[in-house]
Amino acid sequence: MALTTLDPHTALIIVDLQKGIISLPVVHPIGDIIERARALADAFRARGLPIVLVNVTGRAPGRTEQPRQTGPCPEGWSDLIPELNQQPSDIVVTKRTWGAFASTDLEAQLKGLDITQVVIAGVATGTGVEATARQAYEHGFNVTLAIDAMTDMRLEAHAYSIANVFPRLGEAGTTRNIIDNINSKFAYCPFGNRCTEGVEGNDCIGKILFDYR
């Protein structure tokens, strides 16, 4: 289902755009994925909307048929890429599973900000992105998938998620669709998402401007 709207309280979740993962062979140019994720982050920051940056440092402990990497990750493998322009106000979630909500406090943090909708981008479409989308849906969030700001190591996994899974979890849109929707619905916030001087939460100027649009 194509993107129809964004709720007043929407957050962006960027999954696993970290140094070790972007070096893996993916089916779309990783530079394009990074550029679109950065564009989404810039648009959210300009409107004072929350951004969640997710990285992964290992795997869940359960047995699998597919061979698993053993031992610690190389130094710097889990570092978020600098292109995301991480800010002090960004929410950073470190996980050891596919989905960003499992065994983390992400749900509590988002609900503490009254978030009702999430936009999800990142790598890999069929694992980290899909698992995060499934968990967000199960926790009651409206879900939007930025389908041109994600990729996978396997084309069939990427295509299957987009065609068969995502339509059952939420709505899909391109980066341009999502940014256009943000620009049409949300007032520009002069503080970005770096509010200070006691203007956070319900007193945030961005929220006040939105309420009077």
Predicted regions and their residues:
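Acidic-leg catalytic submotif of subtilisin-like serine proteases
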Residues: A11-L17, I21
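Short, glycine/acidic-enriched loop or turn micro-motifs at the edges of active sites
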Residues: K19, G58, T151
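A short alpha/beta connector and helix-capping loop motif
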Residues: V26-V56
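Metal-dependent catalytic neighborhoods of phosphoester/phosphodiester hydrolases
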Residues: R63-Q69
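Active-site-adjacent betaalpha module
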Residues: M1-A11, A39-D42, A46-R47, Q69-R213
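Short beta-strand segments at enzyme active-site cores
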Residues: V15, L49-V56, G62, A146
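A short acidic, glycine/proline-enriched capping/turn motif at secondary-structure boundaries
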Residues: G58-A60, G99-A100
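A short acidic, helix-capping loop that chelates divalent metal ions and anchors anionic groups
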Residues: I21-L24, G62-R63
